[in-house]
Amino acid sequence: MQRVTITLDDDLLETLDSLSQRRGYNNRSEAIRDILRSALAQEATQQHGTQGFAVLSYVYEHEKRDLASRIVSTQHHHHDLSVATLHVHINHDDCLEIAVLKGDMSDVQHFADDVIAQRGVRHGHLQCLPKED
Protein backbone atom coordinates (compact mmCIF):
# COMPACT_ATOMS: atom_id res chain seq x y z
CA MET A 1 0.00 0.00 0.00
CA GLN A 2 1.25 3.48 -0.81
CA ARG A 3 0.58 6.76 0.95
CA VAL A 4 -0.63 9.69 -1.17
CA THR A 5 -1.56 13.26 -0.37
CA ILE A 6 -4.64 15.01 -1.75
CA THR A 7 -5.95 18.53 -1.38
CA LEU A 8 -9.65 19.08 -0.65
CA ASP A 9 -11.58 22.28 -0.13
CA ASP A 10 -13.07 22.77 3.33
CA ASP A 11 -16.65 21.93 2.33
CA LEU A 12 -15.65 18.70 0.62
CA LEU A 13 -13.51 17.65 3.58
CA GLU A 14 -16.39 18.36 5.95
CA THR A 15 -18.68 16.23 3.77
CA LEU A 16 -16.11 13.41 3.72
CA ASP A 17 -15.76 13.53 7.51
CA SER A 18 -19.53 13.48 7.95
CA LEU A 19 -19.87 10.52 5.57
CA SER A 20 -17.03 8.69 7.32
CA GLN A 21 -18.66 9.15 10.69
CA ARG A 22 -22.16 8.13 9.52
CA ARG A 23 -20.86 4.98 7.87
CA GLY A 24 -18.54 4.07 10.72
CA TYR A 25 -15.18 4.29 8.96
CA ASN A 26 -12.16 4.33 11.27
CA ASN A 27 -10.40 6.94 9.15
CA ARG A 28 -10.65 9.02 5.98
CA SER A 29 -8.44 6.63 4.01
CA GLU A 30 -10.93 3.78 4.36
CA ALA A 31 -13.76 6.03 3.21
CA ILE A 32 -11.79 7.33 0.23
CA ARG A 33 -10.78 3.78 -0.79
CA ASP A 34 -14.43 2.66 -0.78
CA ILE A 35 -15.56 5.75 -2.69
CA LEU A 36 -12.82 5.17 -5.28
CA ARG A 37 -13.65 1.46 -5.61
CA SER A 38 -17.30 2.34 -6.15
CA ALA A 39 -16.45 4.92 -8.82
CA LEU A 40 -14.11 2.50 -10.60
CA ALA A 41 -16.70 -0.29 -10.50
CA GLN A 42 -19.32 2.06 -11.94
CA GLU A 43 -16.90 3.11 -14.68
CA ALA A 44 -16.11 -0.53 -15.50
CA THR A 45 -19.80 -1.33 -15.91
CA GLN A 46 -20.08 1.35 -18.59
CA GLN A 47 -17.53 -0.34 -20.87
CA HIS A 48 -18.97 -2.52 -23.63
CA GLY A 49 -18.27 -6.19 -23.11
CA THR A 50 -17.85 -5.96 -19.35
CA GLN A 51 -19.34 -9.00 -17.62
CA GLY A 52 -20.81 -8.77 -14.16
CA PHE A 53 -23.73 -8.95 -11.80
CA ALA A 54 -26.44 -6.44 -11.02
CA VAL A 55 -29.40 -5.95 -8.74
CA LEU A 56 -32.44 -4.22 -10.20
CA SER A 57 -35.10 -3.06 -7.76
CA TYR A 58 -38.38 -1.32 -8.50
CA VAL A 59 -41.90 -0.79 -7.20
CA TYR A 60 -45.04 -1.03 -9.31
CA GLU A 61 -48.82 -1.16 -8.99
CA HIS A 62 -49.78 -4.71 -9.93
CA GLU A 63 -53.30 -3.73 -11.09
CA LYS A 64 -52.18 -0.90 -13.37
CA ARG A 65 -53.19 -1.52 -17.02
CA ASP A 66 -51.40 -4.80 -17.78
CA LEU A 67 -48.20 -3.53 -16.16
CA ALA A 68 -47.41 -6.83 -14.44
CA SER A 69 -47.74 -8.76 -17.70
CA ARG A 70 -45.60 -6.20 -19.55
CA ILE A 71 -42.88 -6.54 -16.92
CA VAL A 72 -43.03 -10.35 -17.12
CA SER A 73 -42.83 -10.12 -20.91
CA THR A 74 -39.73 -7.91 -20.63
CA GLN A 75 -38.18 -10.38 -18.18
CA HIS A 76 -38.82 -13.30 -20.53
CA HIS A 77 -37.39 -11.34 -23.45
CA HIS A 78 -34.14 -11.02 -21.43
CA HIS A 79 -34.34 -14.46 -19.76
CA ASP A 80 -30.63 -15.11 -20.31
CA LEU A 81 -29.76 -12.29 -17.87
CA SER A 82 -31.99 -13.33 -14.98
CA VAL A 83 -30.53 -15.31 -12.08
CA ALA A 84 -33.38 -14.82 -9.59
CA THR A 85 -36.31 -12.53 -8.85
CA LEU A 86 -37.86 -11.74 -5.48
CA HIS A 87 -41.44 -10.46 -5.45
CA VAL A 88 -42.76 -8.72 -2.31
CA HIS A 89 -46.31 -7.48 -1.72
CA ILE A 90 -45.82 -4.08 -0.05
CA ASN A 91 -49.52 -3.34 0.38
CA HIS A 92 -52.82 -3.97 -1.40
CA ASP A 93 -51.73 -2.09 -4.54
CA ASP A 94 -47.93 -2.07 -4.70
CA CYS A 95 -45.30 -4.73 -5.29
CA LEU A 96 -41.54 -4.56 -4.89
CA GLU A 97 -39.42 -6.67 -7.20
CA ILE A 98 -35.74 -7.33 -6.88
CA ALA A 99 -34.01 -9.04 -9.79
CA VAL A 100 -30.49 -10.45 -9.65
CA LEU A 101 -28.96 -10.26 -13.11
CA LYS A 102 -25.78 -11.62 -14.68
CA GLY A 103 -24.23 -10.94 -18.06
CA ASP A 104 -22.87 -8.22 -20.30
CA MET A 105 -23.36 -4.94 -18.46
CA SER A 106 -24.64 -3.15 -21.55
CA ASP A 107 -27.36 -5.82 -21.92
CA VAL A 108 -28.15 -5.56 -18.20
CA GLN A 109 -28.44 -1.77 -18.49
CA HIS A 110 -30.73 -2.13 -21.52
CA PHE A 111 -32.97 -4.57 -19.60
CA ALA A 112 -33.10 -2.24 -16.58
CA ASP A 113 -33.97 0.71 -18.82
CA ASP A 114 -36.80 -1.32 -20.40
CA VAL A 115 -38.29 -2.18 -17.00
CA ILE A 116 -37.82 1.21 -15.35
CA ALA A 117 -39.28 3.04 -18.37
CA GLN A 118 -42.58 1.14 -18.09
CA ARG A 119 -45.39 3.50 -17.14
CA GLY A 120 -46.27 2.81 -13.50
CA VAL A 121 -42.83 1.60 -12.40
CA ARG A 122 -41.43 3.72 -9.57
CA HIS A 123 -38.22 3.85 -7.57
CA GLY A 124 -36.25 1.92 -10.18
CA HIS A 125 -32.60 1.46 -9.29
CA LEU A 126 -29.81 -0.60 -10.83
CA GLN A 127 -26.70 -1.47 -8.84
CA CYS A 128 -23.95 -2.96 -11.02
CA LEU A 129 -20.97 -5.03 -9.92
CA PRO A 130 -18.35 -5.80 -12.54
CA LYS A 131 -17.00 -9.34 -12.49
CA GLU A 132 -13.73 -9.47 -10.60
CA ASP A 133 -10.96 -11.60 -12.07
From Swiss-Prot:
GO terms for molecular function: DNA-binding transcription factor activity; nickel cation binding; sequence-specific DNA binding. Transcriptional repressor of the nikABCDE operon. Is active in the presence of excessive concentrations of intracellular nickel. Keywords: DNA-binding, Metal-binding, Nickel, Repressor, Transcription, Transcription regulation. Belongs to the transcriptional regulatory CopG/NikR family. It comes from the Bacteria. Transmembrane segments: none annotated. Ni(2+) binds at residues 76, 87, 89, 95. PANTHER family: NICKEL-RESPONSIVE REGULATOR. The keyword Transcription applies. The keyword Chaperone does not apply. Binds 1 nickel ion per subunit. Its cofactor is Ni(2+). GO terms for biological process: response to nickel cation. Homotetramer. It comes from Escherichia coli O127:H6 (strain E2348/69 / EPEC). This is Nickel-responsive regulator. Coiled coil: none annotated.
